[in-house]
Amino acid sequence: MACPPELEESLVWKLTDLGLHRHAVQHAPETPDRKQLLLWLPQPEWPEAERQQLLASLEPLAEPFGLPLPQGHWDDVADEDWSLSWKQHWQPDPVGEGLLILPAWLEVPPEHGERLVIRMDPGSAFGTGSHPTTRLCLEALEKAPPVGALVADLGCGSGVLGLAALGLGATAVVAADTDSLAVRATGDNRELNGRPADLLKVSLGSVEALQHLLEGRRADLLLCNILAPVIEALAPGFEALVAPEGRALLSGLLVDQAPRLEQVLGDLGWRVSARGSQGRWGLLEIQRR
C-alpha cells in the first residue's frame, strides 16, 4: 500500500507491535515522499478475512492526521528466502547535499562516491533516515556541521543522527533511548560504521542517562527526534544537558504542534533560532535566551 510520510512511523510501530516483522518501507531516491509499505504474510496462516481485519486495525492510525488509510492490495508470491526478498527493497538513500544512508550490504554507488556514507541495518523498527523528521534533522546537521562539538542524542532510535554528527565533525556523541532494542540497534550500527564505543556511548534511559554519560559536562548540541508531547514533558531537563551557548534540534513534531511547543520552551528560557518543515512535519532549533 501507499505509505504517506505522516503514517510511516505509526504503521511500522503497529506492525512490529503485532509481531509482524516481515515488512519494509521503500521509495525511489528521487521521490522520498512517495513510499510503499510492503508486508509479507504466510498465506496458510492469513486467509483473506484475517488480512482484511489486519488492514481495518490500521485505520485508526490515520485518523489523527485527518487522512484515510490508503487502500492495500495483496499479491501471491512464491515462497523464497525472506532475508533476500527483504533486502531487495532497500536502496541507497541520498539525504541533503552530501549524506548517503546506505544499507549495510550494499556498495557505494559511483554517483554518490563523494557523499558522507552512513551504513545502517534497516532490520530494526527504528529510523534509517527515510522519515521526514529524521531527514529534517540530518539536513539541519549538514547545514551547520557540529565540528568539534559534544553531541547528545535523546531518543536515539537507530543511532543515525549521532553517526551523522560524528561524520560531520563532532568529537563525541552520547545517546540514550528508553527502548532496549533501540540501544542495541545504535550499538550495532555504530559497529557497522567502524566507530569506537568511546566516541558514541549509548545507554538505556532518558535525560538522567544522558547526564550520566556526560559526566558533569554539558553538550554543545542536543538532538531530540521524538513526538511533541514527549519533547514537552522532557523539556525541563534540557537545561541540564545543553551548555549555555549550545543549541538543540527538536523534531518529531507536527507543524501545527509547533506553536504550543514554542510557548512551553519560551517559558523555560529557550528561544527558537530556526524552523524547518517537510510536509506536515516540523523542526525547531532552539538556544538559550
Curated annotation (Swiss-Prot):
Methylates ribosomal protein L11. It comes from the Bacteria. The keyword Lipoprotein does not apply. This is Ribosomal protein L11 methyltransferase. Keywords: Cytoplasm, Methyltransferase, S-adenosyl-L-methionine, Transferase. One of its GO terms (molecular function) is protein-lysine N-methyltransferase activity. GO terms for cellular component: cytoplasm. Its main location: cytoplasm. S-adenosyl-L-methionine binds at residues 134, 155, 177, 225. Its EC number is 2.1.1.-. It catalyses: L-lysyl-[protein] + 3 S-adenosyl-L-methionine = N(6),N(6),N(6)-trimethyl-L-lysyl-[protein] + 3 S-adenosyl-L-homocysteine + 3 H(+). Transmembrane segments: none annotated. GO terms for biological process: methylation. It holds the Pfam family PrmA. It is found in: Cytoplasm. The keyword Glycosyltransferase does not apply.
